[in-house]
Amino acid sequence: MRIAKILLPVSKLFPLDYLITEDLELNIGDLVVVHFRNKELTGIVWELDTNSEAKKIKTIEAKAPLNLSITLEVLELIKWMSSYYMSELGSIAKLVLPINISEKPIKIKEQQVKNHFVLPKLSEEQKQAVTILNESNKPTLIKGVTGSGKTEIYFHIIADYLIKGRQVLIMLPEIALGKQIINRFIDRFGFEPIIWNSSVTKAQKKMILRGILSNKVKVVIGTRSSLFLPFHNLGLIVIDEEHDDSYKQDDNILYNARDTAIVRGKFDKAKIVLCSATPSLETIYNIKTHKYQLVTLANRYKNVDLPNIEIIDMTKEKLPKNSYLSKILIDAIKGNLENKKQALLFLNRRGYAPLMLCKACGHRFTCKFCSAWMVLHKATKKLECHHCGYQSKIFSSCPECLEDETLTICGPGIERIAEEAMLLFPKSKIAVISKDHAKTPEKIAQLLHQMENLEIDILIGTQIITKGYHFPNLTLVGVIDADLGSNNAELRASERTFQLLHQVGGRAGRGDSKGVVYLQSYYPDNIIFSYVKVGDEDRFFTNELEIRKAANMPPFSKTASLILSGFSESKILDIARKIVQIAPKANVKILGPARSLMSKLAGKYRYRILIIADKKFNLQKYLKFWLGFIKIPSYCQIKIDIDPKTFY
């Protein structure tokens, strides 16, 4: 009796035994059609055997259409993911095969790659970068100031791999960033890359997967999930904006796509290129320890000047009530508009106001399901929780003390800034971009097109606008609240603030005119601002690494979080304490249990246990051994977060 263990793309499932018929020849990695729970699914041949402990064994129906298969390298990646991130094989297989490709034959469109590409002439600095990248056998970071032409450099590397007939993956933190890159790609290479993100339809996914498996798809531009596409001939992985937190998935399987891409590159023997003007501290550490190679671009493309950085001391500004733009910034915007230039106002806070409260009794409007304030959205006339999506009406009186006319709103969101800008600049064309105002890639592309065509004078946006966009006529950036996030107790608060300010400032002055960036702050002496002002990221990285080393925190150590959640706070805390009490003795430091920064989410109370260990310590083996001593009750959900990026 011939048996195959079939890995199905079903969450929390391990490989299952199926019988191989006499006329069927199979190899490990082949895709086959099997029945599972009254459904016909496509699975991966995981192992071949002659014995099975199962009493009733179903038979493999057939090979998948076109005799498609998964490479041994992708199988190795699945195994590594399961081991490193302590996740079930079936959950990871679902990332590789997110759709049943055996359903209905579908036409596969082949990308027509020509060997003649229209690539712009590079500067001497860029040519040297391309040479280093071609010769490097390590993951290589292109670290360049904003507007230095990092994209054009990796386009030259892509051209080499396309000529060799290899497949290429370009990873972006958000596909919203992709529209400008896609257009530039088409201009340079003469064909359209395949796009892979959450908005791709089921039918499109099926077509793309078959195209990749049959080597008819050559170039994919996608978000973090594109990393798991089953390429057969992958030669190059580009990780653009490698520092971005969007590469970390914080639900289902908790994994870092940037780090996993590095591992995939090793399995596939693919070149890895990372890009960022503000690299992550982990990447800087890997360069200093010679695991990665560094390519530096000190100058903007065509030697365009970097913007001036001006810090506005808001303690000295006398603002009218409910106003948030300083006189200095207002005057600068007026001058900018007179010169027919565009401006960007940045505030990383959605909605109209982050808090509504009662002046009589102090009642704050918080989410009934989360430990978070309800955000006022004036356009929809709703209070909304940005964590679970719960909405409520805007009250006319306090629901706690029942007093009338005592409710007030505190602080600005971008809708409030837009309202102020419209009053100050009534003749200007003003647009707002955030997850609320641009919910689809198409809407984002429309706003970007309007900016490029000078149909917008002032763009007001959240973090979504900081990610690598190029607007030649944008010469002024105003950061409304530069303090936001920097006083956070999070490990990476300083790093994120520096990256965010540097990135948003980098949108200014990328054309022929010099740019200027205004940072409004109530703490102008914050050392982060001095690093941003002089553009001294190297000194910032050195200082931050010294702080991390003194605290024995990543990248100088390994960390993992155990996140426990459930509807009864006392029961969850009790389980968390028991877990800590039974921890085996080892060379690790255990902190907690403590309430998560987001102590209640979607109705569930949340506690964290943080484990810190030496870099060489096998943390996964220790956690598996430790958690084997306790049975987690059904009322408690536990997640293991290896290399956590946040502690919310």
UniProtKB/Swiss-Prot annotation:
State the reactions this protein catalyses: Couples ATP hydrolysis with the unwinding of duplex DNA by translocating in the 3'-5' direction; ATP + H2O = ADP + phosphate + H(+)
Q: Does the keyword Zinc apply?
A: yes
- Motif DEAH box, residue range(s) on this chain: 240-243
> Per UniProt, where does Zn(2+) 2 bind?
C367, C370, C385, C388
Output the SUPFAM superfamilies linked to this UniProt entry: P-loop containing nucleoside triphosphate hydrolases
So what EC number does this one have? 5.6.2.4
Q: Which residues form the Helicase C-terminal domain?
A: 375-548
* Domain Helicase ATP-binding as annotated: residue spans: 131-297
| Binding locations of ATP | G144, V145, T146, G147, S148, G149, K150, T151
Q: Which UniProt keywords apply?
A: ATP-binding, DNA replication, DNA-binding, Helicase, Hydrolase, Isomerase, Metal-binding, Nucleotide-binding, Primosome, Zinc
Binding locations of Zn(2+) 1 = C358, C361, C398, C401
Name the domain of life this protein comes from.
Bacteria
**Gene Ontology cellular-component annotations:** primosome complex
CDD domains in UniProt: DEXHc_priA, SF2_C_priA
Q: How is the cofactor bound?
A: Binds 2 zinc ions per subunit.
The protein's GO terms of the molecular function aspect are: 3'-5' DNA helicase activity; ATP binding; ATP hydrolysis activity; DNA binding; zinc ion binding
Known Gene3D superfamilies for this protein?
Answer: P-loop containing nucleotide triphosphate hydrolases, PriA, 3(prime) DNA-binding domain
Q: Name one Pfam family in it.
A: DEAD
According to its UniProt entry, the protein's GO biological process terms are: DNA recombination; DNA replication initiation; DNA replication, synthesis of primer; double-strand break repair
Q: According to its UniProt record, which cofactors does this protein need?
A: Zn(2+)
**Sorted alphabetically, which SMART domains does this protein's record hold?**
DEXDc (SM00487), HELICc (SM00490)
Q: Does the keyword Cell inner membrane apply?
A: no
Function field: Initiates the restart of stalled replication forks, which reloads the replicative helicase on sites other than the origin of replication. Recognizes and binds to abandoned replication forks and remodels them to uncover a helicase loading site. Promotes assembly of the primosome at these replication forks.
Family per similarity comment: Belongs to the helicase family. PriA subfamily.
Q: Fill in the subunit field for this protein.
A: Component of the replication restart primosome.
- Name this protein carries in UniProt: Replication restart protein PriA
The organism of origin for this protein: Rickettsia prowazekii (strain Madrid E)
**What gene is this protein a product of?**
priA
